[in-house]
């Protein structure tokens, strides 16, 4: 499909789901600087291949916001697509949030994939929408619904980093985290950034180009450590070593249902700038 055809298909799905405005970030599910091919929804829907930018799709317009590094490239790649270029930082050019505030009205609905927008930004948008009498829908990956030949999620083999190179065992690192949790009065700790998880568990992978990380989430409580990842990427010996250190492997995408099981009075440590919106749903007390 051409970019125009993709946008038309997206608009049809938006209409079916009664979503008036759809936001498409560049982000993956982990706030990574570089993203794998599976996550390049903004590239797919606009044709713009730069590393930074956001798209907003409505029934009567489509826009791309990007910074000064990409003005020339974006203008060339968007030509003939019907996607309008918004040059970030230029005079009289609204930010994405300013644009949404202007366009959204009573009874309208803003949608985005809640796995790709941070909890912090989702809170800001929720507040903005409340003032406008609009609603938010974050359960659907609409671009994924029309992307027929979408690349698969990466599942590169995981390796274990020997403690002589890591400098500290994962057991000792996890003990230090739990001590910090106790000092802060936290019952749980949710970690979503891939480099932090790789460091904490002394594992390395190849799921992001030029970055030795493993697609995963980690949840730690006072008694459990749960790693949400594709078990097929782990050898039997690494799975056994992780198990001996108290780490249980669960399916990668089951994190979203798991966080909903948190007790309402459970206090959870997480970074709302990095953790995505859907990783915080069901969590009332966040530090």
Task: Map each language-model feature to its residues.
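Acidic, proline/serine/threonine- and glycine-rich low-complexity intrinsically disordered segments
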Residues: 280-285
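N-terminal accessory/capping or targeting/presequence segment of soluble
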Residues: 2-105, 117, 121-262
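Acidic beta-strand-to-loop metal/phosphate-binding motif
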Residues: 108-115, 267-273
């Amino acid at each position: 499909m051409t970019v125009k055809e993709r946008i038309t298909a997206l608009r049809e799905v938006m209409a079916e789901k009664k979503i008036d405005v759809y936001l498409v970030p560049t982000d993956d599910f982990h706030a990574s600087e570089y993203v794998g091919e599976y996550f390049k929804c903004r590239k797919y829907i606009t044709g713009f291949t730069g590393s930074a930018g956001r798209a907003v799709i409505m029934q009567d317009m489509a826009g791309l916001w990007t910074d000064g590094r990409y003005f020339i490239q974006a203008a060339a790649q968007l030509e003939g697509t019907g996607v309008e270029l918004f040059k970030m930082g230029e005079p009289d050019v609204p930010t994405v949030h300013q644009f949404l505030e202007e366009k959204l009205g009573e009874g309208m609905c803003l949608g985005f994939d809640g796995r790709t927008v941070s909890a912090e930004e989702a809170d800001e948008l929720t507040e903005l929408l409340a003032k406008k009498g609009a609603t938010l829908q974050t359960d659907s990956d609409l671009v994924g619904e029309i992307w027929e030949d979408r690349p698969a999620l990466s599942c590169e083999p995981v390796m274990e980093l020997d403690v002589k190179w890591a400098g500290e065992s994962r057991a000792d690192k996890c003990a230090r985290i739990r001590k910090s949790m106790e000092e802060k009065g936290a019952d749980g700790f949710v970690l979503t950034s891939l480099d932090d998880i790789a460091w904490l568990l002394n594992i390395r992978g190849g799921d992001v180009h030029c970055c030795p990380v493993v697609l995963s989430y980690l949840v730690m409580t006072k008694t459990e450590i749960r790693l949400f990842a594709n078990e097929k990427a782990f050898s039997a010996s690494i799975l056994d070593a992780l198990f001996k250190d108290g780490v249980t492997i669960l399916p990668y995408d089951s994190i979203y249902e798991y966080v909903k099981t948190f007790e309402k009075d459970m206090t959870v440590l997480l970074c709302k700038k990095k953790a995505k919106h859907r990783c915080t749903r069901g969590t009332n007390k966040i530090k």
